[in-house]
């Protein structure tokens, strides 16, 4: 919803990295997207799908407007696999169920943030930031970048700590009464860990 042409242009101009769209596994399945590689051997196990484009409403697909339109189409639940084509100029990533509590990655972090912000269809656009010399920006560089562009900055560790403080990590699955021969009735509840695989 917030992926405007201006925001995408900012990422392309100042971020300089690959612009990716982090989506939940459920949304990836609804769009019928195949994984880029079945046997993911990348160092961080980033789960890329095939690249995408909106089927309608784009020209070349690469402009900030076209990429923002593709992102909005991919996120909006009223659209499905018939509204997306491949290949394209947006690179979807599959977030793991359980988010940063299962995998402490950028993909999961942006989905966790969107979910915490109350979005019904949590997703987010990410772009790694390159310095002027072509090297990837590290924390001191990112702190300066955030200050220069009036952006907020937080770590994945901060997000994980926030989730542990503010979310219930268990869910009641079953509640029943258990009557025994030796001691009357007991109220029995079974809980499940919501972040285990």
Predicted regions and their residues:
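Catalytic domains of riboflavin
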Residues: 1-197
């Amino acid at each position: 919803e917030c992926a405007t042409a201006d925001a995408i242009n900012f990422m392309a101009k100042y971020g300089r990295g690959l612009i990716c769209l982090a989506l939940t596994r459920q949304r990836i399945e609804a769009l019928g997207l195949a994984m880029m590689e079945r046997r993911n051997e990348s160092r961080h196990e980033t789960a890329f799908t095939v690249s995408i484009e909106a089927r309608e409403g784009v020209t070349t697909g690469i402009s900030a407007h076209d990429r923002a339109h593709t992102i909005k189409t991919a996120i909006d639940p009223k659209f499905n696999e018939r509204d997306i084509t491949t290949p394209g100029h947006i690179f979807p990533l599959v977030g793991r169920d359980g988010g940063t509590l299962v995998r402490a990655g950028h993909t999961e972090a942006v989905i966790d943030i969107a979910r915490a912000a109350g979005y019904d269809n949590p997703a987010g656009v990410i772009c790694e930031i390159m310095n002027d010399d072509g090297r990837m920006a590290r924390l001191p560089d990112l702190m300066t970048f955030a200050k220069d562009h009036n952006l907020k900055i937080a770590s994945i560790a901060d997000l994980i700590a926030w989730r542990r403080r503010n979310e219930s990590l268990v869910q009641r699955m079953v509640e029943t009464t258990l009557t025994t021969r030796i001691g009357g009735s007991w109220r029995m509840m079974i809980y499940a860990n919501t972040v285990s695989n």
